[in-house]
Amino acid sequence: MGIVYRANTSADVNITVPRSGTTHRAIVVFPGYIMPGGTLGRAFAPYVADDDALVVVNYAERGVNVSQIYAKVMEALHKLRPVELRVYGASMGGMVAKLFLDQYRQAGAPYGKIILILDSAPVSRNNVKRPAFLFDVSCWCRGGPLSSAVWAAASQFGPKPPTEDDASQEIVREARHAGAWIGMPAATSQGCFIAKFGVLKEGELLDVAQQVVFLQGSSPDDDPLIRISDAISGWRTAFPNLMVITVQGRNARWHLPLVEYPRETVRAMIATRS
């Protein structure tokens, strides 16, 4: 079925302009693969500062084209003209953020050194609590409508994380529905991308980032998907002075409940000052 199944291969970005009308800081958000960018942008928007702009990446249904993503993000930043740039990568999005910064460096870092926030982000397939063979399979198993329907059915079961009191329940429902119906092409694209992610070089983020922060939920060892301590050690290779912040109101047993805890997440995201 996967051989004849077609999926969208174009990424795009969702832009939230500052409430003040003038951009001081732009926050580029790289979510995990199954989180729709527009939905996450709506969840985060009420909690950023009045002069903050959000540029949230919405991945293609199949494949991660970093050059395409870079071009879309930079086009958005050119329109916003920020003074300060902050980059946030959640789960697999941290890896995408790193590759984005590789191209940003090659372009001469047009907005200067950035602040990079990594939220429960792996740095290699070994940081992910899944059998290794699944990553290899994901690079040749494309997925199709039948496997996507099975994914959606399976996603309906199991406990769901609680939410903050002021989290939009409409946005939560929308994000969960989108995650359930994201489809196997997206799931296999995510696995293959992680499988092919290269080893970090010592100190390689020092010339492009003024600060790197790693966010983790409380009880980080309980994260069901990521070996958090191993991931932190891996990112420290690229930025030795990496800072770790625990989001106390967000239990790690849910991995990344971003739309369920937008206020706590954004508060941690913007807490570090440049």
Located regions from the model:
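Gly/Ala-rich beta-loop-alpha elbow adjacent to hydrolase catalytic centers
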Residues: 88-97
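Conserved acidic catalytic loop of the alpha/beta-hydrolase fold
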Residues: 68-85
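Conserved alpha/beta-hydrolase
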Residues: 46-64
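Serine-hydrolase catalytic core
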Residues: 159-244
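Catalytic active-site module of serine/aspartate enzymes centered on a nucleophile-bearing elbow/loop
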Residues: 240-274
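Active-site nucleophile loop of the alpha/beta-hydrolase fold
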Residues: 59-62, 114-129
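Short, surface-exposed "cap/lid" segments of acyl-processing enzymes
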Residues: 2-51
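Helix-rich cap/lid subdomain of alpha/beta-hydrolase
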Residues: 129-174
